[in-house]
Amino acid sequence: MASEGSPDCCSSEPYAGASSCTTASFCPTSTTYLPSTCATSRCQTPSFLCRAHLPAGCLSPCYLTGGCNSPCLVGNCAWCEEGTFNSNEKETMQFLNDRLASYLERVRSLEENNAELECRIREQCEPDATPVCPDYQRYFDTIEELQQKILCTKAENSRLAVQVDNCKLAADDFRSKYESELSLRQLVENDISGLRGILGELTLCKSDLEAHVESLKDDLLCLKKDHEEEVNLLREQLGDRLNVELDTAPTVDLNKVLDEMRCQYERVLANNRRDAEEWFAAQTEELNQQQMSSAEQLQGCQTEMLELKRTANTLEIELQAQQTLTESLECTVAETEAQYSTQLAQMQCLIDSVEHQLAEIRCDLERQNQEYKVLLDTKARLECEINTYRGLLEKEDSRLPCNPGSTASISNSACEPCSAYVICTVENCCA
């Protein structure tokens, strides 16, 4: 039984014994209420009984919870003739019992929800609890394997590029050597063609001189022949008749003169030939020296150019390798940043979801704490009302021997089991 006590019996403060209780008591599910037969047949209160016959303790107003704080009179069941309470009061008591049972049931359900939420909070707050994340390890392994293959392929491509560049350098060397040899051959052929021209000119000069010598020899023979003919003709004309001796200069020996002329021309020809050979040898030696010096300079320039080309190609290959390595490292850094940003975003989403869940749990806990406080306050008021009603019943029971009337005794004996049953039920619920 429970109701809000009167201002004299129960204040608005919570019950003193409720401060030591942290959780609400459970009401057993086997609690039963009084049957309707007890309320109708055994606790009948006569409606014709006036208020003047009631004692002063029964006329004090008690404020019931189910009656919207409307005061009602609790009669003395030992003094009444047919029962302790009237029908309205019994209905109010039954309503209070139902309400107390519903409050206790609600307290039990809230405690279960509180325990479940505490378990969830404990599971969320455990240090070894790892967040559930999707397993991307096999994808990471595949990506790492593909990255290794890509790096190996890039290294192989770099090695092949170096080999191709080396082959190009060797081909350039052979091409430069071929070009140098070709230029030397062209120079030699040009020199040979020039010398052949000079040789042709000298041959022409020689043939001209030989033709001139032959013509001179023919002239000499003609002169000799003419002279002999003239001599013979004169001898035939003169015969032996005249022996003329002329005191003239001795005659010139034409053969000797011709021999001298021949020797002179031969000496001139030999001198010219020797001078031409010396000039040709000097020119050839000078050209050979110039060719050798030019070839040495050309070879040095070509060697220096090849060295510079080789150095430039080596530096270009190193630059390409460094650029490839830089690009691969930049790609690796970008992939790593993307991977860690994805993981960070996943972790942040997980943290946000957990924080949202914790905020919801805190809100639920605060709401349940408020409801729990309200229920504790209600329980304290109900216990205060129960104690008030128990005190009133005990007072009425203590007055029972002093009240006269056999009808009251019969009514007391008829209603006592009902009130005792209700008190026991409430005590079992609040134990």
Curated annotation (Swiss-Prot):
The record marks A338 as: Stutter. GO terms for biological process: epithelial cell differentiation; intermediate filament organization. Coiled coil: none annotated. Residues 89-400 form the IF rod domain. Keywords: Coiled coil, Intermediate filament, Keratin. Residues 237-252 are annotated as: Linker 12. Residues 253-396 are annotated as: Coil 2. Residues 136-236 are annotated as: Coil 1B. GO terms for cellular component: cytoskeleton; intermediate filament. Residues 1-89 are annotated as: Head. Residues 90-124 are annotated as: Coil 1A. Transmembrane segments: none annotated. InterPro entries: IF_conserved (IPR018039), IF_rod_dom (IPR039008), Keratin_I (IPR002957). PROSITE patterns: IF_ROD_1, IF_ROD_2. It holds the Pfam family Filament. Residues 125-135 are annotated as: Linker 1. Residues 397-431 are annotated as: Tail. GO terms for molecular function: structural molecule activity. May play a role in late hair differentiation. Heterotetramer of two type I and two type II keratins. There are two types of cytoskeletal and microfibrillar keratin, I (acidic) and II (neutral to basic) (40-55 and 56-70 kDa, respectively). Belongs to the intermediate filament family. This is Keratin, type I cytoskeletal 40.
